[in-house]
Amino acid sequence: MAKTPAKAPAAAAKPAAVKKPAAPKAAAAPKAAAVATPAAKKPAAPKAAPVSKVAGTREKPDTIRAGTGKLVQVIGAVVDVEFTGELPAILNALETVNIATGQRLVFEVAQHLGQNTVRAIAMDATEGLVRGQEVRDTGQSIRVPVGPGTLGRIMNVIGEPIDEQGPIKSDIFRTIHRDAPTFAEQTNTAEVLVTGIKVIDLMCPYTKGGKIGLFGGAGVGKTVTMQELINNIAKAYGGYSVLAGVGERTREGNDLYHEMIESNVNVDPKINGSTEGSRCALVYGQMNEPPGARARVALTGLSIAEYFRDEEGKDVLLFVDNIFRFTQAGAEVSALLGRIPSAVGYQPTLATEMGNLQERITSTNKGSITSVQAIYVPADDLTDPAPAASFAHLDATTVLSRDIAAQAIFPAVDPLDSTSRIMDPLIIGQEHYDVARSVQEVLQQYKSLKDIIAILGMDELSEEDKLTVARARKISRFLSQPFHVAEQFTNTPGAFVSLKDTIRSFKGIVDGEYDHLPEAAFYMVGPIEEAVAKAEKLAGEA
């Protein structure tokens, strides 16, 4: 009786082994599960999704398995990829090779569509892709090189060099999607960041770790002002700068790169053989790039800046030009993904995307990131959702005026429209606050008198008003300053003016100590001593 049952399983096992099509049935599945431990982990793949999410923001766990899929649909900058096994997490990077160009092409997962299919945004042109070609899941979000090797180099959104100077010499990589610093890591001390530019330091002082909005149209000196800030911060603090060109014109980006070399902010690798000694890294997502690249290039630049802040303890200056184009690219991506648009056609996630970017720009107990963001205002409407989303995060606004630029006063910062959150006597000091308010008062009185002067002339003003106008005109000219980065155009040495000298100089003008000096002496000088010397020179020439 014992032999019969023993033969029965053996007999049953043979048909199971012979009939290979029957292997997928339930009879074979338990046996595979009992024998092969790794196979047993595959059904548990959904549990690994949270781990993948963590990998997208912090570090890459060794336990994540990269899967492969195939391309099933291409719609412009959006592609659908079908996976047979584990689906990649949202924000994971997918890689393939563009058959037409032979170049590596990176996608970012944006949606799970069901039926083992994900929808992803391309970071480069999709011309040349074919259905059915293999796509690999990297198991984490887009990684870019960071560290000193990026200084003086130009890279694109996925960290590839585009300056034709060979590979970027860095073995340190970071993902572009990361968590903002925790509350314990952040510092809440309001410290003034001295830029060496008189009008900014006096009227709208910047904060270390703050966000500054630079409002300006074309041709008012926005690029030169940004360059001077990069130069001054790097010299004064030994810090580094990162420029993220979001929707930049290719010509402007090329000009800026060469201007930085000419102004000694960066080192020319063609002359020196390397970029060692450079102080600025450049990341460009140009105007002709797909919306995915333009929507992520700001995060690439921010990741480089975060490394210098967290690992090297530097005070970093981050420029984003233009925040409006960052928002615009997000709206394009949102439309491609089929999301219902919000107000004025913008993406419904506008506030979230802006918050994710801005919250990472902050001071920690290791270093700081100070961000200067150029912001375009559509149709001069400040209530437009795009600039309105930025306003909630800004600590200071620097407004460049075309009227002031027309008077050849550079930087063309409007001292009456520019504001700062730290314009408080408890933070900047009572003397600084009083001098700044006195300057604003004189300029405001002059502004209100301009109509009377235009109609009736200066002769109809009272003696007190005439004195106010004279001092206001001297203040307006003294707010100008020669820039280091413009030396090659003006043949005038640049001036870095300390905050102490700035306050002392303007206090003297407001108090009437320099009423005897001519207006021309105050134009394009550094501290007040240079104005006095210029007045003596003008008197000697006369």
UniProtKB/Swiss-Prot annotation:
Its job: Produces ATP from ADP in the presence of a proton gradient across the membrane. The catalytic sites are hosted primarily by the beta subunits.
UniProt-listed Enzyme Commission number(s): 7.1.2.2
Keyword match Ubl conjugation: no
Compartments in which it is found: Cell inner membrane
NCBIfam families: atpD (TIGR01039)
Regions of compositional bias (Low complexity) in chain numbering: 1-50
Region Disordered, annotated ranges: 1-61
Residues binding ATP: G216, G217, A218, G219, V220, G221, K222, T223
Quaternary assembly: F-type ATPases have 2 components, CF(1) - the catalytic core - and CF(0) - the membrane proton channel. CF(1) has five subunits: alpha(3), beta(3), gamma(1), delta(1), epsilon(1). CF(0) has three main subunits: a(1), b(2) and c(9-12). The alpha and beta chains form an alternating ring which encloses part of the gamma chain. CF(1) is attached to CF(0) by a central stalk formed by the gamma and epsilon chains, while a peripheral stalk is formed by the delta and b chains.
UniProt KW keywords: ATP synthesis, ATP-binding, Cell inner membrane, Cell membrane, CF(1), Hydrogen ion transport, Ion transport, Membrane, Nucleotide-binding, Translocase, Transport
Protein family per UniProt: Belongs to the ATPase alpha/beta chains family.
HAMAP family: ATP_synth_beta_bact (MF_01347)
Broad class of enzyme this protein falls into: translocase
Name of this chain's protein: ATP synthase subunit beta
